Amino acid sequence: MSIFPTKILLATDGSKEAQLALASAADLSEKTGSELHVVYVGHMPLVSYESPGATILDPDLRRRMQEGAEQEARTMLEAQVQQVGKSGGEVAGVHARLGRPDAEIVGVADELGAGLIVLGSRGVGPLRRALMGSVSDSVVRHAHCPVLVVRE
């Protein structure tokens, strides 16, 4: 039995901190022989910026917004896979989700049976953390596997 995880899940949002997490996850994956999976969680805006006054309940508008969010997720994931490839690593799977990042990251980790989640931390201030919470804090609290939070 190995002490190393067989699957590592990298959670990314394309930020500078996520790039640091990507480097750590790719390095760990390569050195331990673990599969590397990447997840990006897009969000669905509650209002439309293209049609002021339109609500998210409009099925056509909701579909277009969802397609836009899914395209954003695919673009982000493609860029992350290329970054891992440039560092000599390989991505075993990509996962695009829409929703709350913390819940979706933990959900994907559970689906995969990931042995480690790697993500960056933005170091939000105490007021923002109190009002909105921190994705990394929430993932650490709710994940069913170890979590590596990479800071600058």
Role assignments for model-derived ranges:
Residues 116-138:
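Glycine-rich, Arg-bearing micro-motifs that act as flexible, cationic patches
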Residues 1-4, 17, 31, 78-117:
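Structural beta-alpha unit
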Residues 2-59:
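Small/aliphatic-rich secondary-structure junction motif
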Residues 45-46, 101-104, 126:
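Generic structural signal for helix capping and beta-alpha/helix-loop junctions
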Residues 40, 121-122, 151-152:
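Short secondary-structure boundary segments
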Residues 58-75:
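A short acidic, glycine-rich active-site loop
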Residues 53-57, 111-113, 135-136:
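Short, hinge-like loop/turn segments at secondary-structure boundaries
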